[in-house]
């Protein structure tokens, strides 16, 4: 079976009415438009998303009237920065922008993959951060407001 569109989000489904099969993906896999997956029941499915469709943690595909395939995302260690004020947010954004690392900004925190160079720069600039195990709802992404290139 090949799915071409996300039918719903698990949070919007009455899970008591369905048998749920789960696939756990890496956050990087959420960026893929074409992927082959194997559920926790051993069933294989293809996902070839139509234009405009995106995977996220909790994406759901209806297999039939009684079965749903749910997408989960594995946790990963990430650098988590909670800037103490707008000045630190600006400095941090400038530093991270220069590294061209994919990030996620959510709930006044900045998330990015663990990187020893970034850790060293944050430490040198005395910007507090932690390493936390996080499950991302969406993949980290590059902020590209323009076609900026070096």
Swiss-Prot record:
The source's superkingdom equals Bacteria
Set out the biological process GO terms recorded for this chain's protein: protein folding; protein-containing complex assembly; urea metabolic process
Give a yes or no for keyword Cytoplasm in this entry. yes
This entry carries the following GO cellular component terms, namely: cytoplasm
Give the GO molecular function terms. Answer: nickel cation binding; unfolded protein binding
Check the record and name the SMART domains matching this protein.
UreE_N
Where mainly found? cytoplasm
Q: Which SUPFAM superfamilies match?
A: Urease metallochaperone UreE, C-terminal domain, Urease metallochaperone UreE, N-terminal domain
InterPro entries, sorted? UreE, UreE_C_dom, UreE_N, UreE_N_sf
Record keywords, A-Z: Chaperone, Cytoplasm, Nickel, Nickel insertion
Q: Which residues cross the membrane?
A: none
Q: Does the keyword Chaperone apply?
A: yes
Q: Where in the cell is it found?
A: Cytoplasm
Function noted in UniProt: Involved in urease metallocenter assembly. Binds nickel. Probably functions as a nickel donor during metallocenter assembly.
Q: Which family does it belong to?
A: Belongs to the UreE family.
Q: Which HAMAP family match?
A: UreE
> Which NCBIfam families does the UniProt record give?
PRK13261.2-5
Question: Protein name, please?
Answer: Urease accessory protein UreE
Q: Which organism is it from?
A: Streptococcus thermophilus (strain ATCC BAA-250 / LMG 18311)
């Amino acid at each position: 079976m090949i799915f071409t569109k996300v039918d719903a989000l698990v949070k919007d489904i009455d899970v008591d009415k369905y048998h749920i099969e789960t696939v756990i993906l890496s956050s990087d896999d959420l960026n893929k438009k074409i992927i082959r997956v194997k559920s926790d029941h051993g069933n294989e499915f293809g996902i070839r998303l139509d234009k405009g469709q995106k995977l996220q943690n909790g994406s759901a595909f209806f297999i039939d009237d009684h079965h749903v395939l749910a997408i989960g995302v594995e946790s990963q260690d990430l650098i988590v920065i909670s800037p103490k004020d707008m000045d630190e947010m600006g400095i941090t954004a400038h530093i991270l922008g220069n590294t061209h690392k994919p990030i996620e900004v959510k709930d006044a925190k900045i998330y990015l993959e663990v990187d020893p160079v970034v850790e060293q720069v944050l430490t040198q600039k005395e910007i507090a951060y932690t390493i936390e195990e996080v499950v991302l709802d969406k993949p980290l992404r590059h902020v590209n407001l323009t076609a900026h290139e070096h």
